[in-house]
């Protein structure tokens, strides 16, 4: 057993309208290579827990999967791929809770926070600024955060019926709850640079290159370590991840 680990939830959800299987193995392979390179244990969760309806809520059960022995832990979404030469993320923090700011859509964040604050009394008065709001798809933390995840897990289980039948569209499922709980519990945090989670890569132009200098290197490869293919229509996402992998898979051997 190594001292650090990364967990990915890669469940083909029967409740999803689209299949993600066409790129699962590519993203998994990139993370497996990275973890082997840096002596990190890698867990892939492929099946649902009987008491959890949606795959997205399995991240809150991270310590049920990895136990108490690891010093530092990461949880990453299945639509993330890590660059072959990315440095060891676990060398970049101590005992903080780490994530990348998510400021792709201020309107979406505002709507989401309002929806969850108004739906749960315990979150109604939790303050939150845009300089605090992180993306929930790439998280790194310490073993001391187990009690925090227990609170998230218990929040879901206590409000399971409401969460499983959530009826407010366009506000996400657990990301804003994560952020509100981080503030509510006074968790010490560290904001990671954008290169560690390229959320909103299309809007930010990460798929382009510097044509003025005739530099053909895509900004994604030039400036990103963890490529997050979210915010893209599912079929386009499938095609993009497959195309990216076909162009770079030789670096993961």
Residues covered by each model-derived region:
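N-terminal anchoring/stem segment of glycosyltransferases
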Residues: 1-71, 246, 250-253
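Short, solvent-exposed loop/turn segments at secondary-structure junctions
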Residues: 11-14, 49-50, 80-81, 103-106, ...
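Non-transmembrane alpha-helical segments in soluble domains
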Residues: 32, 90, 179-183
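Short, solvent-exposed polar/charged micro-motifs at secondary-structure junctions
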Residues: 52-55, 108-111, 199-207
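GT-A fold catalytic core of metal-dependent nucleotide-sugar glycosyltransferases
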Residues: 55-114, 139-141, 145-149
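Charged, low-complexity C-terminal accessory regions
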Residues: 63, 74, 79-95, 104, ...
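Short, flexible, basic/aromatic active-site loop/helix in glycosyltransferases
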Residues: 116-130, 147
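Catalytic core and acceptor-binding pocket of nucleotide-sugar-dependent glycosyltransferases
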Residues: 131-239
């Amino acid at each position: 057993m190594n001292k650090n680990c990364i967990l990915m939830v890669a469940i083909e959800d029967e409740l999803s309208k689209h299949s993600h299987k066409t790129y699962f193995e590519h993203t998994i392979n990139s993370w497996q290579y990275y973890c082997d390179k840096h002596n990190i244990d890698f867990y892939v969760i492929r099946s649902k827990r009987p008491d959890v309806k949606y795959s997205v809520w399995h991240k809150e059960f991270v310590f049920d999967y990895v136990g108490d022995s690891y010093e530092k832990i990461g949880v990453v979404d299945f639509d993330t791929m890590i660059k072959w030469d990315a440095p060891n993320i676990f060398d970049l923090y101590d005992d903080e809770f780490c994530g990348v700011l998510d400021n792709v859509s201020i309107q979406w964040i505002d709507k989401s926070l309002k929806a969850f604050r108004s739906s749960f009394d315990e979150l109604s008065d939790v303050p939150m600024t845009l300089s605090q709001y992180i993306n929930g798809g790439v998280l790194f933390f310490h073993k001391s955060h187990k009690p925090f995840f227990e609170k998230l897990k218990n929040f879901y289980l206590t409000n399971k019926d409401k969460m499983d039948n959530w009826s407010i569209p366009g506000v996400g499922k657990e990301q804003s709850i994560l952020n509100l709980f981080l503030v509510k519990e006074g968790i010490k945090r560290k904001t990671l640079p954008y290169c560690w989670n390229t959320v909103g890569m299309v809007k930010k132009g990460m798929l382009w290159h510097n044509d003025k200098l005739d530099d053909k290197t895509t900004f994604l490869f030039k400036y990103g370590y963890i490529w997050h293919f979210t915010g893209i229509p599912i079929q386009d996402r499938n095609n993009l991840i497959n195309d990216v992998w076909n162009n770079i898979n030789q670096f993961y051997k």
